[in-house]
């Protein structure tokens, strides 16, 4: 009895301490809780990346055992470094057959030019500035993501969705020299403004988004779908009445502006190089190492890609299964809790990818913009489920680093 009483007495201070921590945590402002979550998740990713950096051998990007900043600036980071230093080429590089090869025109200008401006002001290195721009943009994206989830989910679910956002397998993008974090911040802000029906305020955000990541056409499609639903089934968008000719003008303007900015970069590449298909041919260069040089035929790249990876007819069958699975997730009754706007964005972005993107090892990174669908993943309240989901995300993050980021000899799986 005495032993049992002593054990109970010893556990009381521990329980009291845990209770105090939980209470204090719940009393913190939502933005401070998200900041803590984001900071802890970035520490975790830093540990994982540093582990790979310690075993990294010399390669075309870095020396053996590079510093964290050097290791975080490889792959596309090398292209952004070139753009920040010298801008874009006026003459496209070509191979012996006359086909355009990989070059800087594949990358939008907002991120590298922002980095260059800050380098000029601070005198800091590209690696330092580029990683910090991504880190701060990722922090902003996490805060906006929580606000966006909070429009549809209760605080607990919204916070858990943000935890998943912070530890997702490709959340590495929040602390490397890539434009994804900056692009995601702008995208989430545009979606939040859409949910708030602040259409005119969306315009500068959409303009910046379109020159940060190639999402202009997809966002334009989202706005077209939004207007159609607003006219035909306004209740699905929580609207008290149908969109009229007058009230449809603001979202229609956003759709037009987003579409134009989506076409602007190919037009700029044409104007600078004198080659009408400079941007398209540059993008095709990246897939030529898989399937050789071929023209872009909309809505065929995924059939080609799945055929290359899995052979036919297995590739096409698997592609159909993937698309049906995506539709099942987006249109299941439970998914209605995150709002039709976010689900329509997932559909619009997937349609855009199906039209132009060739699935390869960077597919996981390219899917980052559908992060708002994590709200569906966050719906179950089971603690076991939530812990298991976070653990799985961290394991997949390590797996992604192993297969896609770490350079292991001749690496053909770029992130």
Label the model's feature ranges.
Residues 41-58, 220-329, 342-346:
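Membrane-lumen/periplasm interface segments of specific transmembrane helices
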Residues 190-201, 381:
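Membrane-interface transmembrane helices that cradle and orient dolichyl/undecaprenyl
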Residues 117, 129-152, 325-331:
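Transmembrane-helix motifs of polytopic, lipid-linked glycan transferases
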Residues 99-100, 105, 109, 113, ...:
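Loop-to-helix entry region of an early transmembrane alpha helix in multi-pass inner-membrane enzymes
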Residues 133-136, 152-156, 160-192, 209-219, ...:
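Multi-pass, polyprenyl lipid-linked donor-dependent membrane glycosyltransferases
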Residues 125-129, 145-167, 342-344:
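Transmembrane-helix signature of polytopic, membrane-embedded enzymes
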Residues 75-93, 97-123, 293-303:
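Short hydrophobic/aromatic helix or loop-helix immediately within or flanking a transmembrane segment
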